[in-house]
């Protein structure tokens, strides 16, 4: 997986946690059998920044833990490629995830587990949204998404 990590925090996200995000998302990509050339980004930010995104794009006037921006590719507005390029393996950008490091800290403390478990939980949660899963559609969809999320994290080794 081609993963861009952007750190917009004031304090900085340490290399260990950036590497953890890379490893967890690479594992999740393999778990979902995504092509190796799948692209996405994760941006770390503070509450002030994610609050602005939450307000602008979701109409919710407060910070949140994670926001996903999926890149929809329905094919209707994509250019037609020459035949010789049709068989080429083109990278597929699935979207962007924004994560509040402030909320990672507070939720990990509140839930009684490690910062690493909460970080993994949030990036996998956002990753699943980028891949079409949506817990807001109903009880069955919520169960499917959260079961898959737990399965990925447990199998990776980030258990509660």
Curated annotation (Swiss-Prot):
List of residues binding Zn(2+): 125, 129, 135
Transmembrane segments: none
Domain of life: Bacteria
Cofactor remark from the record: Binds 1 zinc ion.
Assigned GO CC terms: cytoplasm
Keyword flag Cytoplasm: yes
GO biological process: rRNA processing
Similarity field: Belongs to the endoribonuclease YbeY family.
Name assigned to this protein: Endoribonuclease YbeY
Origin species: Leuconostoc mesenteroides subsp. mesenteroides (strain ATCC 8293 / DSM 20343 / BCRC 11652 / CCM 1803 / JCM 6124 / NCDO 523 / NBRC 100496 / NCIMB 8023 / NCTC 12954 / NRRL B-1118 / 37Y)
């Amino acid at each position: 997986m081609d993963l861009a990590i952007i750190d917009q925090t004031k304090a900085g996200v340490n290399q260990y946690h950036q590497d953890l995000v890379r490893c967890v998302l690479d594992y999740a990509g393999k778990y979902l059998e995504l092509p190796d050339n799948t692209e996405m980004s994760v941006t770390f930010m503070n509450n002030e920044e994610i609050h602005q995104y939450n307000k602008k794009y979701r109409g919710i006037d407060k910070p949140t833990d994670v926001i996903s921006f999926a890149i929809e590719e329905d094919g209707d507005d994509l250019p037609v490629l020459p035949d010789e390029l049709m068989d080429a393996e083109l990278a597929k950008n699935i979207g962007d995830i924004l994560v509040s490091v402030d909320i990672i800290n507070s939720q990990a403390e509140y839930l009684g587990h490690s910062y690493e478990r909460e970080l993994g939980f949030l990036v996998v949660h956002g990753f699943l949204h980028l891949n079409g899963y949506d817990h807001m559609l109903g009880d069955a969809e919520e169960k499917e998404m959260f079961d898959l999320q737990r399965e990925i994290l447990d199998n990776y080794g980030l258990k509660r």
